[in-house]
Amino acid sequence: MVELRPSLDIVAPFFNEAASASAFARLLGELEVAVAQRFGMTVHKILVDDGSRDDGAVRFSQALTGSWEIVRLSRNFGKEVAVLAGLDQSRGDMVLIMDADLQHSLDISLKLIAELVDHPDIDVVYAQNDRREASWRRSQLARLFYSLINSSQRFDIPENAGDFRVMRGAVARALTSLRDKRRFNKGLFAWAGFRQKALPYSPEGRASGTSKWSRLNLIAFSLEGFTSFSVIPLRLISLSGLLAALAGALYGAKVLFEVIFYGIAVPGYPS
């Protein structure tokens, strides 16, 4: 009887990463060998082309080894949707999500997997950016964002935790059942629950190119998360509506009072 080995799926979305394709394919190959040796697991690699305008998909297909597939999206939907597309294809006992820009190292990836393997009571191990390289202003803005978004919820979104994480297959299945059109993965990962553990890390520098996240993209992303996972905007809108209604009622009472008791002719409806 053939004994089935546990399996690990690696989901890696990419956008215009042709320059780093060969290096990332090598990293995945090294990771596959290390995972097989240390944990006795088979590895299947799922790369998601998020509408790249370069030949990254071709370069990946030429450089990848072992078991792999490339999911090609019809346009650039954004990383959040690309991650979902990869999770939709995953069938492994565990699923590792990592970036294709080489900022997520082999060493940290193995540590994440080891934590999950060694702790059967844990369902998710996520990498938490220690922000050593971030400016003081950016760190303070991030802290303010998380304090606001977590101030009115029954669950907390971990600070500085992104998509870089490993999870059990059951968690991946639960996440794929959440079909939000406007996705904010940080919030969805936390909302889904399960037993989660943080692993601090410092991301590597990009191997080539620049970040695809502009300041405007970051602001839009933050607003998406804030409006999706905080009741503060709804309460502010409700309060502003209440104040506007109260102001209108007071003004209407003032107009009627002047017409009835002082005979002041106000042009318009009270005359």
Residue ranges and their predicted role:
Residues F24-L27, L31, L112, L144, ...:
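A ubiquitous structural signal for well-ordered alpha-helices
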Residues F15-A19, Q103, D107, T176, ...:
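Residues in soluble alpha-helical coiled-coils and helical-bundle/repeat scaffolds
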Residues M1-S7, K186-S271:
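Hydrophobic helical membrane-anchoring modules
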Residues L73-R75, K79-Q89, L106-N185, E204-L223:
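Acceptor/aglycone-binding surface of glycosyltransferases and processive sugar-polymer synthases
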